[in-house]
Amino acid sequence: MGITGLFGFFQTGDVKLVGVLLMAVLPFGFTWLIEMLLYRQEKAVESEEIIVMPVNGSVEQLENAEDTVFASKALGDGVLLHSDDGKVYAPCDGIIQTVFPTKHAIGIESTDGSEILIHMGNNTVALNGKYFTVHVKEKDEVKAGQILAEFDKKEIEAQGYNCEIPMVVTNMEMYEMSGEPTYRNYKKGEEIFRLKKKTNV
């Protein structure tokens, strides 16, 4: 019949048949459209990675870091943390990629692919591991909230060091923060920000 023949049929054929066909097809079309919209919303939510507070303490802007390398975001974007008790926990599920020999910094690759560096203290590399205890090793799988390290805050500060903790996403070029972090006191395990993969990377 061809397309032109079909148009002719609908113009001259039984109008009731057209109505029946429309009634049969339209519900499927609406159902498909609704399912696609819900699927896209679900995928959008799934693509956001939740980063939780790795210490009991406070969060402030990374730009306030005493270490200018972190403050300038040369190593990536993130937040500046202050621990109340010197205990550091995993901010996400992932694998330990790096434990610095001096124990003052730990790198994690999350299960979603973000690479997070937690740096304990400013210039504390000079302590050569003194006052630090690390509870994980490279290639260990960790869960969010699992203890990673401890440091003796009192002793480190007595030596004249700042115990601030920059936490940065070192492959931030692949991500964007979904919503600005709230700068306040948190308990470990509370959500502090989300990461969303950039679509054009």
Predicted regions and their residues:
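Short, glycine/small-residue-enriched coil/turn segments at secondary-structure junctions
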Residues: 48-51, 78-104
